[in-house]
A protein has these predicted regions:
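Phosphate-coordination loops involved in phosphoryl transfer and adenosine-cofactor binding
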Residues: 17-19, 94, 141
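Rossmann-like NAD(P)-binding element
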Residues: 63-91
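A short helix->loop->beta-strand "cap" motif at the edges of active sites that frequently abuts
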Residues: 41-42, 92-95, 116-118
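NAD(P)+-binding Rossmann beta1-loop-alpha1 motif at the extreme N-terminus of oxidoreductases
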Residues: 2-62
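An accessory alpha-helical subdomain
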Residues: 169-258
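Rossmann-fold dinucleotide-binding core
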Residues: 103, 107, 111-169
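ADP-ribose/adenylate-binding Rossmann-like module
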Residues: 91-107
Length: 258
């Protein structure tokens, strides 16, 4: 597909992202669409969704979406490898594949094995639609982990600087470091949130401030059952965290019996 662009928008240091493809249009894909329109308004956005018919305005075929300067794979973790394999034969040689999955060891291993010479960057935005809405669109302090990439150093530096200019906090770490931290934070929050939700515990008219904070966390994750299961399945550190939690729970319960 050969499209003409009115005015390429430099992200920074001369790096031009004229078009951004988004594969997957769930809650996070929709948020990405909003953010691109906000922070890169000159860039054309092409969305591929299996649930939407291409209209040439917002939604495009996979082939058209793949011809973007950068393509974000905003798909569930379990669908990441298939999505990558489907799009690789269709992209331009310089198209940057952007991984935004919640786990990084799993997806970076796939990228190394499957992507070949295709440039990619593995990231994890540590926030989602609910956080964005609660903050009324204020992204200051929102963290984005940059875990691994195959980009030229000047391109990587330019992208990182652009994210900082938008207000995000950029955190660099290895996929292993990311997944270890995530197992002890996000996964544990999801685990406790699912337990509280399954138990039918709700807010009351005499809530303490600390209980209110707990319920804020529960309400932010209780509807993400599929993500919760995917993180447990594809993050190699979650089982150990769950074992530690269960041991600690047993110790605390015994203290109450003394």
């Amino acid at each position: 597909m050969n499209r003409k662009f009115d005015s390429p928008r430099p992200i920074s240091n001369g790096v031009n992202i004229r078009s951004i493809g988004i594969v997957g249009y769930g809650a996070f894909g929709k948020l990405l669409h909003t953010l691109v329109g906000r922070f890169a308004p000159s860039a054309e956005v092409r969305v591929f969704s299996s649930r939407e018919k291409p209209d040439g305005k917002t939604f495009f075929t996979l082939e058209e979406t793949a011809q973007s300067d950068a393509v974000v794979l905003a798909v569930p973790i379990h669908a990441f490898e298939d999505a990558l394999k489907n799009i690789l034969p269709l992209v331009c040689k310089d198209t940057v594949i952007i991984d935004v999955a919640t786990v990084k060891v799993h997806t970076t291993a796939i990228l190394k094995r499957v992507a070949g010479e295709q440039p990619y960057i593995a990231t994890h935005p540590m926030w989602g639609p609910e956080s964005y809405e609660k903050r009324n669109g204020d992204v200051s302090g929102f963290r984005i982990v940059l875990a691994e990439h195959s980009l030229p150093n000047e391109v990587y530096t330019a992208l990182a600087e652009f994210l900082k200019q938008c207000g995000f906090d950029v955190v660099e770490m290895t996929p292993e470091q990311h997944d270890k931290h995530l197992a002890e934070t996000l996964f544990l929050t999801h685990f406790i949130g699912q337990i509280v939700a399954q138990g039918g515990f709700n807010r009351t008219e005499i809530d303490t401030v600390s209980f209110g904070y707990l319920m804020d966390a529960v309400e932010s994750v209780k509807h993400d059952g599929k993500l919760f299961k995917d993180v447990y399945t594809f993050n190699p550190y979650c089982k150990e965290v769950l074992e530690r939690f269960e041991i600690s729970e047993g110790k605390v319960s015994k203290l109450l019996e003394k």
